[in-house]
Every structure is written in C-alpha cells, then in structure tokens.
C-alpha cells in the first residue's frame, strides 16, 4: 500500500513539530510535553512528532530518552520505574511526562509521528492506538527494524509505517536492489539530510532520491532541519515533509511559499 492509501498523509509539504518543537523559544527545556505540543498546535501545526517508552508496569509515555536524567528532575531508566514514579518527574522542573493516550486526547485534530524507542513499548503502542481508534492519526517508525516488524505483525496494514533502516540504506547506497523496495511495507522514508560514513559526510537527500522514493508511492520526510536555507533547499528538491525543532522558522518558510497551514 502506498502513502496515498492512508488518510494520515496530507498533501505535501507538511511540517512536523519535533518533540513538540523543542527549539522554539517557548519550548526550551520542555520537549515532549503537553505544553510544548500546545505551542505547536497554536502555531497551526497539525503534525506532531514524539517517541515512546514503556514504564515497568506497562504505561506508554511520550518521552525520547531511555532515562529521565537529562530533561527531568528525577533519575532512572523508564523501563525500571513504575508509572507513579515517572509521573512525579517534571520536565524542565515544571511539566509532567505525558502518556501517549493523554497526547492523543489533548489534540484530537493532530496527527502524530511516533518513534518506538524500546521493545517493551511495541504492544502498549498498538493497544493505545486501538483503544483510541487512532489508526488514521498516526505513523509509526523506529531505528530498530526488529521493533518495527514487531509492530507491523500486530497492526497489519491498518497503520502507516516508515521504511526501516534497511530501506533507508537500500534507497541511497544500494541502487541495484532499489527495485525490491516496490514491495516495502513502509509508506514514508524518514531520513536525515546527511550521514557520516568512515569520516566522510555524505548528502543523503538528493532529487534522484526523492524521485525514486516517489516512484514507489512513498513520501520523503527529512529530520531534523532547523535552518531556513536548508528547509528551502529540501522543499525545492520536492520532499514531502520536514521535521523541525524550530517550528517558528519552518512555519515562516512554508507560509512564504503559500503552504501554511500545511
């Protein structure tokens, strides 16, 4: 199935608020909080990006790191803590760690790109999507092909998913096997602008890459892009989505092109 078969994907280009727009002045220090996501929505964002972990007792939280330490006033691995302890933590010293179901309920008009960060989050994620009938509101990806395959086994084709790491490598570095991706279960290639290989910085996103992905009926979403000149270049190449921490700057770039709200 192609991206066109999934209501999740709006006509491009679309802007995605990375962790709610972690680099926006109002969101500094409070990434992945309901307050940060509210800022993005207030700017007109319909697409939010977040990550999920599961607590020791199976609660699914919208949180990037494996540990609480970097962004909260508590310490410890989320997987080792019960929800009541994670719930007591404050991001930036003031905002609670949200559960994914709270995010879905707080912003019913938003579509959410979800990165599975841990194996224990796979089943709770599917259960949360089912409980909220959010099949058309989410796209699921992961840096782990194993986690992504496990999610697809549960969800089948009901939920849009990203091409895994194998798909990313094949599309850019293995042109002789690109044709095999015509049957990829993913609907979107999520990719950074560059990648370092053996000390060399390689440009990943080119017009040839974008055109190739489009031929397979997939979209191209690029992360994490915070410079307006880079945003302009990528849009000129025909990418379908840009994931950004600087949601204010991305909004301005899209608005100048007459593509806001996206």
Regions found by a protein language model. Give the residues of each.
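Phosphate-group recognition and catalysis centered on beta-loop-alpha active-site segments
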Residues: 1-262
